[in-house]
Structure formats: structure tokens, C-alpha cells
């Protein structure tokens, strides 16, 4: 998306130079100026953010265009399971679990059987 796709009605400079008509009970010029100062700051911030996002978008599109295509013939990266420490087998794990249950539950396990 480029800025040509959006229509901007005002620039920060146009907001700054805007003159307001005042009547007998018109707006306070100080209040209007203070508010417009905030609008100008926000407008400038939005413009900077849009430019930064457009630059990032261009960079990412170029990065994507330059990235090699992954085809079905290329295997997806796989994660290998962590190697078990020496001596740790399913039997050892079950034995540890049994000992832990006996320690935690004590005679309660024997009473339920």
C-alpha cells in the first residue's frame, strides 16, 4: 500500500496556518491554537509512523521475494528429541514413580488394594 491510495485533506503546515473567524462570542484564540498544536504533533507522528511502516513493508516484501521457495521435496526442519541421560529407561522411570508413590501415600495405597 502506498500513500497514493489514500487521500489526505490536510497537511501539518495547512493545519498550522489555518485562520479561524471569530465573532462576538467566538472561540478563544489561545484554546484553538493549543488544540491545533496537539493536532499538528499527532499528525506529524502519524506521518512518521506511516513512512516507517511503508519502509518496513518494502523491506519485508523484498526479503520475501529474495527468500528461496520451499518445495515439497525439501524436508521441513525437524527437531530432535533430547537424548535421554545414560541409565534412564522406562523401567527406571516406573521404578522411581513407584517409590515416590509409596513415599507420598505410604500405607494408603496398601489399604485400598
Curated annotation (Swiss-Prot):
GO cellular component: cytoplasm
Keyword annotations from UniProtKB, A to Z: Cell cycle, Cell division, Cell shape, Coiled coil, Cytoplasm
Compartments where found: Cytoplasm
Phenotype of gene-disrupted mutants: Cells lacking this gene have increased lysozyme resistance, which is important for escape from the host innate immune response. The lysozyme resistance is OatA-independent, but is dependent on PgdA, and an increased N-deacetylation of the peptidoglycan is observed in these cells. The phenotype is suppressed by the concomitant deletion of gpsB and pbpA1.
Highest taxon of source: Bacteria
Coiled coil: 36-68
GO biological processes: cell division; peptidoglycan-based cell wall biogenesis; regulation of cell shape
Assembly: Forms polymers through the coiled coil domains. Interacts with PBP1, MreC and EzrA.
Family: Belongs to the GpsB family.
Function (record text): Divisome component that associates with the complex late in its assembly, after the Z-ring is formed, and is dependent on DivIC and PBP2B for its recruitment to the divisome. Together with EzrA, is a key component of the system that regulates PBP1 localization during cell cycle progression. Its main role could be the removal of PBP1 from the cell pole after pole maturation is completed. Also contributes to the recruitment of PBP1 to the division complex. Not essential for septum formation.
The name this protein goes by in its record: Cell cycle protein GpsB
Amino acid at each position: 500500500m502506498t500513500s497514493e491510495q489514500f487521500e489526505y485533506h490536510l497537511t501539518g503546515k495547512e493545519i498550522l496556518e489555518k485562520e479561524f473567524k471569530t465573532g462576538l462570542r467566538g472561540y478563544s484564540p489561545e484554546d484553538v491554537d493549543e488544540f491545533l498544536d496537539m493536532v499538528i504533533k499527532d499528525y506529524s507522528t502519524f506521518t512518521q509512523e506511516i513512512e516507517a511502516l511503508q519502509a518496513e513493508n518494502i523491506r519485508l516484501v523484498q526479503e520475501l521475494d529474495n527468500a528461496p521457495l520451499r518445495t515439497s521435496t525439501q524436508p521441513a526442519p525437524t527437531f530432535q528429541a533430547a537424548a535421554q541421560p545414560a541409565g534412564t529407561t522406562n523401567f527406571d522411570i516406573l521404578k522411581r514413580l513407584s517409590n515416590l508413590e509409596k513415599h507420598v501415600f505410604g500405607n494408603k495405597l496398601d489399604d485400598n488394594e
